[in-house]
Amino acid sequence: MLMKIKTSIHPSSVVEEGAQIGEGVRIGPFCHISADAVIGDGVELVSHVSVMGATTIGASTKVYPMATLGAPPQNTKHKGGRTTLVIGANCTIREGVTMHVGTDTSRGETTVGDNGNFLAYAHIAHDCVVGKNATFANGATLGGHCEIGDNVYIGGLSAVHQFVRVGDNAFLGGCSAFVGDVIPYAIAVGNRASLRGLNIIGLKRAGLPRSEIYLLRKAYRTIFDRSRTVGENIEFAKAEFASSPTAMKIIDFISSRGKRHYAVPSLKGGDGDDTDDED
């Protein structure tokens, strides 16, 4: 019979009355947990962690020293209403990471998906939505209202402008500034960032069939053919690649335009790249 691990709270830590603490939670020295916090089963707060406001931390997430989760948004329009931060299960949140709650003038919640890996000093601003399996390298920063898809990698010391969208499986290089939306499956880098092809290595590691990668490369060339407008290319691509789910994901992403323009290929970019997708 499996033994349940007891919850342990270091005597130097403060857990406000009303906080919901799951089973098998370990709260190390000098942590502070707010009354509105929900800490899932098996969470570990190593030490010196602040969990503020209405913050939920999913099961088996580990948070390292000096991380601050659920602080008020850095937004002058916020009136102080109750807003939330929801962090998924099995995340790793390293030293000095900051994640803020949403604003009461927008969606009111900041959401982080399961299995995220957020390295030291990464920042997720108010009202952002971050998908599953995200990796933020050291110092990667999101402005408010960003939408980040699943399996996205953001390189160290890179900044993503507010309201920017990043599609699934995109690879964002380090020391870069992203002011336009980045399509799914793309590599983007630079200040200001441009597309440098497709994240071919990442797609292979994800198990995408060679035939689908071929169609995706062909669709990429079609969409960004400089002899026509992007709008014309999209209409052509909708008919040409209707049978390819991955190509249609790019087409749908561009068709559902957000508040920002799109990052487009660099003149030096190709239709694929050998850039690795790990730190």
UniProtKB/Swiss-Prot annotation:
UniProt EC number: 2.3.1.129
Keyword Phosphoprotein: no
Class of enzymatic activity (EC top level): transferase
Top-level taxon: Bacteria
CDD domains (UniProt xref): LbH_UDP-GlcNAc_AT (cd03351)
Principal subcellular localization: cytoplasm
Gene Ontology BP terms: lipid A biosynthetic process
Subcellular localization, as worded in the UniProt entry: Cytoplasm
Oligomeric form and interacting partners: Homotrimer.
Family, per entry: Belongs to the transferase hexapeptide repeat family. LpxA subfamily.
Function, as annotated: Involved in the biosynthesis of lipid A, a phosphorylated glycolipid that anchors the lipopolysaccharide to the outer membrane of the cell.
Protein name per its UniProtKB record: Acyl-[acyl-carrier-protein]--UDP-N-acetylglucosamine O-acyltransferase
Annotated source species: Mesorhizobium japonicum (strain LMG 29417 / CECT 9101 / MAFF 303099)
Annotated gene: lpxA
